[in-house]
């Protein structure tokens, strides 16, 4: 285990799920304990270490101090460091958001020693008893190693939602991408977490298997969801940056990069094959084309499929206009195609940048890469 750095003030990790935008962020460990996935570059240069429980509790104390200042329960002092300012900023944001949820950063909060994590959870609840939800990223293999009773204890202490990177249910792609887990292990982890009373949020990454494995990935991933029935299914379209290890597969011709239209087709096949579950589906990530693709299964399934079909049935020029509008952040949903101001703005950009059907795919790919910190 790498040497744990000394406490140097309040820490923030690099990322969080979009759904945790209003949560207090507390860093439980630095980097990713696995850090071998060929499709991910978030933590490549971050040495992994698990923070001491005492250091996390110091972060909690600092946030509590600034919360009390903001709520006029404590006389203010001058912030002393950049870390102090980060704690103040986080406390202010959290107070404005209602102080109901907490997200543990970085890659897998369950890697902390179970007794120490329990200690942190107890302290967090004592300090902020109004908290309703505590969440963390969690790997399926880690969930499977933990006793069910330990997971139930976490749930009692309000650690009641896991964000799980399923990515795909296809074993071949999982092995190719060095995910370190099998389809069956992902099913078992999801069922186990839910048996403990913990909500699970499964991430699906369409496009990961290229054109070659898109169909099988959609079907196998749907099969996992059908067996687990997760509380949330969140779609995260694949973005292919040159600094990712998986980029080599595309250079060698092992995989072929799908374009937006093909990725949406994969998503449609996935949704079409979800049966007998009651999950909430959400397409809330900046990399997704159809942000309005969301709803409760099974009642909203036909509406979501109809939305996809509406896009796929658009003329190619209109599809390309919307794709560029989304990638530039000018358009947010398909209804924006009826907004003449936004349509004209995208058309002007296409004319000025000489974007047409011969280069739209390459342009959109570059814009996707710019949208994420990898």
What spans do the regions from the language model cover?
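Catalytic cores of alpha/beta
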Residues: 146-152, 210-227
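Conserved SAM/AdoMet-binding glycine-rich loop
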Residues: 65-196
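Aromatic/hydrophobic pocket-lining residues that form the small-molecule binding cavity
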Residues: 56, 117, 147, 186-187, ...
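Hydrophobic faces of well-ordered beta-strands that scaffold small-molecule active sites
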Residues: 24-26, 102, 134-136, 162-164, ...
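Conserved strand-turn element in the central/C-terminal portion of the radical SAM core barrel
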Residues: 141, 165-175, 192-217, 236-242, ...
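Auxiliary Fe-S-binding modules of radical SAM enzymes
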Residues: 1-20, 226, 232, 240-374
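Conserved, mostly hydrophobic/aromatic
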Residues: 32, 40, 56, 104, ...
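Canonical Radical SAM [4Fe-4S] cluster-binding loop centered on the CxxxCxxC motif
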Residues: 15-77
């Amino acid at each position: 285990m790498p040497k744990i750095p000394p406490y140097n003030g309040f820490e923030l990790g690099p990322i969080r799920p979009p759904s945790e935008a209003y949560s207090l962020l507390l860093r439980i460990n630095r980097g990713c304990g696995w850090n071998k996935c060929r499709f991910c570059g978030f933590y490549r240069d971050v040495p992994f270490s698990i923070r001491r429980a005492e250091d996390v509790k110091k972060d909690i104390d600092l946030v509590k101090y600034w919360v009390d200042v903001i709520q006029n329960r404590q006389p203010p002092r001058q912030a002393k460091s950049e870390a102090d300012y980060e704690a103040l900023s986080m406390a202010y944001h959290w107070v404005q958001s209602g102080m109901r949820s907490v997200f543990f950063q970085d890659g897998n909060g369950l890697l902390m020693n179970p007794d120490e994590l329990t200690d942190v959870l107890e302290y967090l609840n004592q300090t902020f008893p109004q908290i309703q939800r505590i969440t963390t990223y969690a790997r399926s293999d880690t969930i499977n190693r933990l006793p069910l009773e330990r997971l139930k204890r976490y749930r009692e202490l309000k650690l009641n939602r896991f964000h799980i990177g399923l990515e795909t249910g296809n074993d071949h792609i999982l092995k190719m991408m060095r995910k370190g887990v099998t389809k069956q292990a992902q099913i078992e982890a999801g069922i186990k977490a839910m048996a403990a009373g913990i909500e699970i949020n499964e991430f699906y990454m369409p496009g990961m298997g290229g054109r070659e494995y898109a169909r099988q990935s959609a079907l196998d991933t749907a099969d996992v969801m059908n067996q687990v029935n997760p509380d949330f299914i969140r779609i995260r379209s694949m973005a292919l940056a040159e600094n990712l290890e998986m980029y080599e597969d595309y250079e060698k011709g092992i995989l072929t990069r799908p374009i937006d239209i093909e990725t949406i087709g994969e998503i449609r096949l996935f949704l079409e094959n979800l049966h007998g579950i009651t999950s909430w589906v959400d397409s809330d990530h900046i990399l997704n084309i159809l942000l309005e693709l969301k709803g409760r299964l099974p009642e909203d399934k036909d509406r979501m499929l109809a939305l996809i079909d509406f896009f796929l049935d658009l003329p190619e020029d209109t599809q390309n206009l919307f794709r560029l509008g989304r990638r530039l952040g000018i358009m947010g949903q398909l209804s924006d195609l009826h907004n003449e101001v936004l349509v004209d703005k995208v058309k002007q950009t296409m004319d000025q940048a000489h974007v047409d059907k011969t280069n739209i795919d390459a342009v959109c790919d570059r814009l996707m890469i710019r949208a994420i910190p990898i």
